[in-house]
């Protein structure tokens, strides 16, 4: 039942941008800024109805998560052992959290985009009012922290968590690799937020990618180290 409630929440959150956009567009000019260059200058204006594109994309991404969750729920029902059932259930729960987090993050991004477009269109300006890249990076940082706290709850599987040849060796290598990976992704989130607050959105994005790359490399190396220790036992 918990997964069913979480899936309902995921779809409700995913639908909110569609509803908000439908209402907000009633008060918007027919032509609004649709795209900006790296410096925030508007390089394309378009019909306000184009604002529905992002909410529709959010719905399709949510559908993807819904189908993936369904696969694990089916695996749980058809599991031959209790261990397999628990692993599938755990993965389904984590995917629910991922789906909800993604819908919230993209939704907030869309609200900022709508607000910025509304202000700029009414003012007749040629420059973005809000640095959307900055907002996106901060939201990504928050999502990293949230996901990091849930990574350790995922049982061994082929979809969710730190999945290397070495981490998949057994439950012990999986648990230790994911615990370390969770710490790395949380630190990545914190560093991304701190960096972005004091820099531009573009700079924050570059540093976020660097942090992610370093976190990935360190986690993979640690996973191999844990595996080597495990096979020597």
Where are these regions (language model features)?
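Select subsegments of transmembrane alpha-helices in polytopic membrane proteins
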Residues: 6-11, 54, 64-69, 95-106, ...
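Membrane-water interface of transmembrane alpha-helices
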Residues: 27-28, 61-79, 146-161, 222-229
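Small-residue-rich transmembrane alpha-helices that serve as helix-helix interface/gating elements
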Residues: 139, 205-219
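Alpha-helical transmembrane segments
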Residues: 13, 44-64, 129-147, 210
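Ordered, amphipathic secondary-structure segments that act as subunit-interaction surfaces
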Residues: 68-122
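Cytosolic, membrane-interface loops and tails of multi-pass inner-membrane proteins
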Residues: 40, 75-88, 156-172, 233
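Short, Lys/Arg-enriched N-terminal segments with co-localized hydrophobic residues
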Residues: 1-5
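Active-site and channel-lining beta-strand-loop segments
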Residues: 23-53, 160-169
């Amino acid at each position: 039942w918990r997964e069913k409630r979480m899936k309902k929440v995921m779809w409700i959150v995913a639908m909110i941008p569609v509803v908000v956009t439908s209402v907000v567009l009633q008060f918007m000019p027919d032509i609004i800024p649709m795209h900006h260059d790296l410096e925030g200058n508007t390089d394309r204006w378009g019909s306000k109805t184009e604002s529905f594109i992002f909410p529709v994309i959010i719905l399709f991404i949510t559908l993807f998560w819904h189908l993936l969750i369904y696969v694990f729920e089916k695996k749980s029902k058809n599991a031959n052992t209790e261990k397999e059932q628990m692993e599938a259930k755990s993965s389904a729960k984590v995917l629910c959290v991922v789906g909800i987090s993604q819908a919230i993050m993209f939704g907030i991004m869309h609200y900022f985009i709508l607000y910025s477009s509304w202000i700029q269109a009414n003012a007749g300006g040629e420059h973005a009012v809000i640095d959307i890249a900055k907002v996106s990076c901060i939201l990504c940082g928050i999502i990293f922290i949230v996901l990091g706290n849930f990574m350790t709850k995922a049982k061994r599987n082929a979809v969710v968590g730190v999945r290397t040849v070495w981490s998949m060796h057994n439950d012990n290598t999986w648990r230790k690799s994911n615990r370390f990976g969770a710490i790395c992704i949380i630190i990545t989130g914190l560093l991304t937020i701190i960096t972005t607050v004091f820099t531009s959105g573009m700079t924050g994005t570059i540093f976020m990618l660097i942090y992610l790359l370093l976190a990935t490399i360190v986690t993979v190396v640690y996973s191999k180290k844990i595996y080597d220790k495990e096979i020597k036992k």
